[in-house]
Swiss-Prot record:
Family: Belongs to the APLF family.
Biased composition range(s): Basic and acidic residues: 12-22, 40-64, 137-150, 221-230
InterPro entries according to UniProt: APLF, APLF_PBZ
Function: Displays apurinic-apyrimidinic (AP) endonuclease and 3'-5' exonuclease activities in vitro.
EC code(s) of this entry: 3.1.1.-
Record field: compositional bias (Low complexity): 1-11
Lineage, uppermost ranks: Eukaryota, Metazoa, Ecdysozoa, Arthropoda, Hexapoda
Organism: Drosophila melanogaster
GO-annotated cellular components: nucleus
Mapped zinc finger ranges (PBZ-type): 121-142, 161-182
MF terms (GO), sorted A to Z: 3'-5' exonuclease activity; class II DNA-(apurinic or apyrimidinic site) endonuclease activity; zinc ion binding
Composition-biased stretches (Acidic residues): 207-218, 234-244
Pfam families listed in its UniProt record: zf-CCHH
Listed name of the protein: Aprataxin and PNK-like factor
Amino acid sequence: MSATDASTADSGAKRKSSEDITHNCNANFGAENGLRKRVKSEEPVASIKDETNPEVPMKIKAEPVENADEPTSTTPAIKIKAEPADNGNSPAAAMVKTEPTNSNAQDAADESTVSSSSIRTSCRFGIRCYRRNPAHRSAEAHPGDQDYRRPNFPAPPLGTPACPFGNACYRRNPVHFQDYSHPADFNSAQNIRNRLRQRRAQRQNDDDSGTDEEDEPFGGDNDRDADYRPGADINEDEDDELEFDSQPISGDDYD
């Protein structure tokens, strides 16, 4: 064999060995990639679900929050603790806070609110009612009662004479409103308030003028005996305000 043939054979052997090495490297690399892909595909995927399962039963335990500084008029916050059921699922704990309410304001609203079923018939004479029968007082509401409603008197029959006081009339007797007619823009409540102001001013002036007579306690008693009227010293201002601060109702019930 010549030297040329020997060198050619060596070159072919080296080329073959390098191709084998390259092939083996590619095979190993492909095997490693396949193994990595297989391992990655076999890894469990953790699914995240925000929604709670409605089928999972939950036990709710209410625990009051202890707070000594809280006033008695406010509703304490309630902590709701969700405990896992028998199936082993453990839902997250939830905190539910109730809005505090003012019990004093609520009680005042409850006292001022009267249900329609408990409203009694209002006495048509209001504060001017002279009846002292307990049965009448319990059967009909009077000024000062929560269910008292100030009546709006109906229009008198046609042909009744006009009230001599006109718009300045401050009468409240229902018989007067049946015997006399009043203008269309007549405001009885406003007239009575004006009358109350005049009465207070007159009483204040009388008190101021009577201070000079305090030095003589018995002076002038004989002069006032003729002007004495029973019940004239009774203060009716508060009763009048009770009546006219009440809610008006239709006067058709007083026909």
